[in-house]
Design a protein with these regions (language model features):
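A short helix-loop-beta-strand connector motif used in the catalytic cores of GNAT acetyltransferases and
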Residues: 54-68
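Secondary-structure boundary/capping residues
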Residues: 41, 60-63, 127
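A short hydrophobic/aromatic micro-motif that marks alpha-helical segments and, especially, helix-coil
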Residues: 15, 43-45, 58, 161
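Acyl-donor (CoA/ACP) binding surface of acyl/acetyltransferases
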Residues: 1-34, 66-171
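Conserved GNAT-fold acetyl-CoA-binding loop/helix
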Residues: 31-53
């Protein structure tokens, strides 16, 4: 395992092909379908193809830079944290924790450990957090991690126009 960073409860590490089944299963809950539909992997093969691509990005500063979030206590893969380029010099934070592990502070813990380290590594000073307004839990994660909201209203999100919130974090 090529560990990026550890916290009290989590290991944030590069993905490996043997994680594809967990990534597939973790992506299938209704919250993922509603809030990040482009990150649902309907088949194991879809997950494998994505993991293979993400693995090819390690060592790059172009992104996307996606890392698995593993529970230390039992080595369970509970999700991921990521930085994704969204335009010239602009990056977005993303995170997902499997439904069975939500509301335990894991997303906040992962983002707090991952973000400053990766921002320095990639050489960026601002990172954006974009979420659907109805995804209140994601808003709490961003707030706890020091993001400041600068827009709430109608905006483009994935394949349409929805009520969204945009926040920014500065190094």
């Amino acid at each position: 395992m090529n560990v990026l960073v550890e916290t009290e409860r989590l290991i944030i590490t590069e993905m490996t092909m043997d994680m594809a089944m967990d990534i597939h299963k973790n992506s299938l809950d209704e919250d993922t379908r509603r809030f990040v539909p482009d990150e649902v992997f309907e088949t194991l093969e879809d997950a494998k193809e994505t993991v293979e691509f993400l693995m090819s990005q390690y060592g790059s500063t172009d992104g996307p830079l996606v890392y698995a979030v593993i529970l230390k206590v039992d080595d369970t893969n509970i999700g991921y944290v990521q930085l994704v380029p969204i335009g010239e010099g602009k990056w977005e934070i993303g995170y997902h924790v499997a439904k069975a592990y939500t509301c335990k502070g894991y997303a906040t813990e992962a983002v707090k450990a991952f973000l400053p380290l990766m921002a320095k590594r990639v050489g960026i000073e601002e990172v954006y957090g974009i979420r659907l307004l109805e995804n209140v839990s994601s808003g709490r994660v961003l707030e706890k991690c020091g993001f400041e909201t600068f827009f709430e209203g109608e905006g483009e999100y994935h394949d349409g126009v929805y009520g969204i919130s945009k926040s920014v974090w500065k190094l």
